[in-house]
């Protein structure tokens, strides 16, 4: 007891000596954080759930507080989007006749299942009832045996024989029940077979089958086995995938367009084969891949294709599963392509995002040939930048066309000048030195080959000479036409002196004159509307008159 009392006294002294407030005040901020973390590990708050007691070991700062409702909404949205993707990738479409037959099959199957279940339940109930009866009889026999303990051994043997007979009867009943179930199933199958045969034997069904056979072309069925596959496609696109891929690889010059729009369940490997085959093709102008389930891998392959292809002008990849990364990759490779004029990538499954839109606007500056873009920008900034860049490209294309037209006109003029020089016998370049006028369109008519001469009257028979004499001979136009003669007539021009002319030095620009031209033109203000008095008129006349025209006037008597 003495030792225990001593220990308690020492603990009390230690508690009195230790001051926690002073110790905590002396600790630094880092030491306080360490102490707090250790205390949380040693003695966690019992009111918190287990998931929040655990220490957060992530270095990244949290983006926001935990929200259970937003997490549930996100999970529901992910589940719904996954279901929509599966429905879009594997659409289930049937023709009306197929839907009817499928409904009939389902109804017949339901009836068969219900009949089988009903028969099984009935037989099971009968078996259970028989077992209960047999158990009841055995219980009665046991009670009788207890009461009649003094009976002979013969009676015991008879009781054992009765038990064996009851077990055999139960087995026989179970076998009969199984046979009845099998017979019911066979009967159901026979009923369904009879119903299908009756439907086939009906005159309406026979007429429909005859119509279908008459609509089909036996030549097409014999030559092309893919005809049946194409006709059953619900999208309506009758493109033969294998045949078109073969033609693209062979670089068929007759194939100018490749349309794969709305074709269901195209494997990704085949899409990649199409895109890779387009790299070396030189004849296809339009390539359409709308609503075919293309993803980022197809987009990256398209970007590489645009980097190498030099013939495609329009590309359509609308209504697919391409994200912003794939679109940015395509736009990045457009700086190496100078033939694409139209690009459509609207209505994607995922939003591109603001960063992708700004990147598209930045990358489009390096391309000078794209004229149309099928996409609605969400941000106003990239939208304005892209519209300005497309108008710039259109202006450049217009200027290029105008230059080509001018060059074509110059070539035509040179051809006409060469024709003039050859026709007039001038040496080459003499027409320009003489300062001749520019060739006119009438010169082509002048230098056309002359019409054939009339036949010699000596070689013509006498019967045709009288007819030729009656008809007045028409002189050729190039001899009597005065306008063409005036154009061909050369003009007299003074010869240029060989001595170089004394050129005047260029006038220096006067800065004061330039400043005056930059000033706005002063407006002449109209005079104020004031009535002129006789005194003002007199003074005005005196100002505009001279002393020679003044008349001497005598002074009145009053003034004198």
Swiss-Prot record:
Q: One of this protein's Pfam families, by short name?
A: Tropomodulin
For the biological process aspect of GO, one term held by this record is: actin nucleation
According to the UniProt record, where is the region Disordered?
Answer: 45-68, 127-217, 437-480, 494-530
Q: What is its main location?
A: cytoplasm
Q: Which UniProt keywords apply?
A: Coiled coil, Cytoplasm, Cytoskeleton, Disease variant, Nemaline myopathy, Ubl conjugation
User: Could you state one GO cellular component term attached to this entry?
Assistant: cytoskeleton
Which Gene Ontology MF annotations are present?
actin monomer binding; tropomyosin binding
Q: Which residues form a coiled coil?
A: 16-42, 386-425
Q: Where is the composition biased (Pro residues)?
A: 448-458
What compartments host this protein? Cytoplasm; Cytoplasm, Myofibril, Sarcomere, M line; Cytoplasm, Myofibril, Sarcomere, A band; Cytoplasm, Cytoskeleton
Q: Where is this region: Interaction with tropomyosin alpha?
A: 1-49
Is this entry keyworded tRNA processing?
no
Tissues where the protein occurs: Expressed in cardiac and at higher levels in skeletal muscles (at protein level).
* Compositionally biased intervals (Acidic residues): 142-167
Please list the residue ranges that the record marks as compositionally biased, kind Basic and acidic residues: 168-182, 194-217, 498-516
Every WH2 domain range: 534-553
Q: Where does this protein have compositionally biased stretches of type Polar residues?
A: 183-192
- Role played: Essential for the organization of sarcomeric actin thin filaments in skeletal muscle. Increases the rate of actin polymerization.
Q: Which family does it belong to?
A: Belongs to the tropomodulin family.
Describe the disease involvement stated in the record for this chain: Nemaline myopathy 10: An autosomal recessive severe form of nemaline myopathy. Nemaline myopathies are muscular disorders characterized by muscle weakness of varying severity and onset, and abnormal thread-like or rod-shaped structures in muscle fibers on histologic examination. NEM10 is characterized by early-onset generalized muscle weakness and hypotonia with respiratory insufficiency and feeding difficulties. Additional features include arthrogryposis or congenital contractures, ophthalmoplegia, a history of prematurity, reduced fetal movements, and polyhydramnios.
Write down what this protein is called. Leiomodin-3
Q: Which gene encodes it?
A: LMOD3
